[in-house]
Amino acid sequence: MAWHKPKFIEVSCAMEITRYAPADGDEPILF
């Protein structure tokens, strides 16, 4: 279960970055 917390943090960070990323960025908006 130790890896669950960091995983959640990574996902949250990815979602936050995606939120502020431009729609025409390198990666498509998935969230």
Curated annotation (Swiss-Prot):
Crosslink (Pyrroloquinoline quinone (Glu-Tyr)) position: 16-20
InterPro entries: PQQ_synth_PqqA (IPR011725)
Pathway: Cofactor biosynthesis; pyrroloquinoline quinone biosynthesis
GO biological process, one term: pyrroloquinoline quinone biosynthetic process
Keyword tags: Plasmid, PQQ biosynthesis
Pfam families for this protein: PqqA
HAMAP family, sorted: PQQ_syn_PqqA
Known function: Required for coenzyme pyrroloquinoline quinone (PQQ) biosynthesis. PQQ is probably formed by cross-linking a specific glutamate to a specific tyrosine residue and excising these residues from the peptide.
Family: Belongs to the PqqA family.
Protein name according to UniProt: Coenzyme PQQ synthesis protein A
Species in which this protein is naturally found: Rhizobium meliloti (strain 1021) (Ensifer meliloti)
